[in-house]
Amino acid sequence: METVSTQRETASSETERTREAASAETTDATFRSLEEGSTISSRYSETASTASEDAVCWLRRTAIVMRVYGLLTLETAFSVLISALVWLGYPSLGYECRDDPSPLLLSCTPVLVLGALELTDHRHPSNGLVFALYVALLSFTTAGLNLCATAPIGVSSLILTWTLFVACNGVAWEHRLSSVWRDALFTSTLLTVMVSVLASTYTWLHKTLLCLYTVFVGCILAVLFQDVRYIATKMPVSHIIRSSLVLYATETLIYHTTLLMLTPVVWSARWDQMFSYLAKLGTYHHYRVDNGTLSVILNSTTATFQSRVA
C-alpha cells in the first residue's frame, strides 16, 4: 500500500512539474510574441516615419525644382519675345556680318555670364535685381546676334537648341540609368555625329567646323548635366535664382553657337574689317552734320547780305 501511495505521489508531482513547465513555456512564448510584436510595431513606426520624412523631402525638392524651371521658362519666353519683336517690328533692319563681323562678339556674353555665376558660386548675389540684369543682358545680346541671320535660321537654331537641352535634362533626371550607361550613351552619340559629319559630302572646311561645333556643344551638355544633377539633389533654396540663370545662360550659349553654325555668312566673314560698318555710320553722320552746319551758315550769311542791300 505504501508503495502504491508513493507511486501516486510521484506521478502527481511529475504531473505538476509538467504542468508548471508547460505554463512556463507558454508564458515565455507569450512574452516572446509580445516582444516580437513590439519590435515589429517599432520597426513599422520607424519605416512609416522614414517614409513620411522621405515624402516631405521629395515634396520640398520638387517645389524647388519647379521654381527653378519656372524661372527658366520665364527667361526663355522673354528672350524669344524680344527677338520676335526685333524681327517682326523691324523687318528691314539687318547687318552685313560678312563685311563687318563685330556683332559676332555678342556670342561671348553667355560665356562671361556663366563664368561670373560659376566662379563666384556662393558669393554671387541672388536677388531680383541680378535676375533682371542678367536676363536683359542675354536677351538683348541674343536679339543683336539675330541680326546676322534670317528668321528661318533663327527658328531652326531655337528648335535644335531646345531638343538638345531637353534631351540632356531628361538623361540627367533618369535615376534608373547608371553612370556607366550615361557615359556610354553620351560618348556613342558624340562619336556617331562626328563620324556622320566626316562621312558627308561637305568640304573639309565645313567638316572641320561641324566637328568643332559637335565637340563644343558636347562639352556644354556635359557641364549642363552636372548642373541639372546638382539642382535635382543638393541645391539649397537660396540658389534658386542663380541656378535658373545658369541653365538660362547655358541654353543661350547653345543657341548662339548653333545660330553661328547654321549661318553661312559667318563662315566667310572678313575679320580684318571689324567695326568697319560702325565707322562708316560715324563718317556718314559726321558728313551730314557738317553739311547741315554749312548750310545754316550760308543761309544766315545770305540773309544778312540781303538785309544790308535792302
Curated annotation (Swiss-Prot):
Tell me the gene name.
Answer: US14
TM segment ranges:
68-88, 100-120, 125-145, 147-167, 185-205, 208-228, 246-266
Per the record, which residues fall in region Disordered?
A: 1-28
Species for this entry? Human cytomegalovirus (strain Merlin) (HHV-5)
Q: Which domain of life is it from?
A: Viruses
**Name of protein:** Membrane protein US14
Q: Where is the composition biased (Low complexity)?
A: 1-13
Decide whether keyword Iron is in the record: no
- Could you confirm whether the keyword Transmembrane appears in this record? yes
Q: Which family does it belong to?
A: Belongs to the cytomegalovirus US12 family.
Q: Give compartment(s).
A: Host membrane
Report how it sits in the membrane: Multi-pass membrane protein
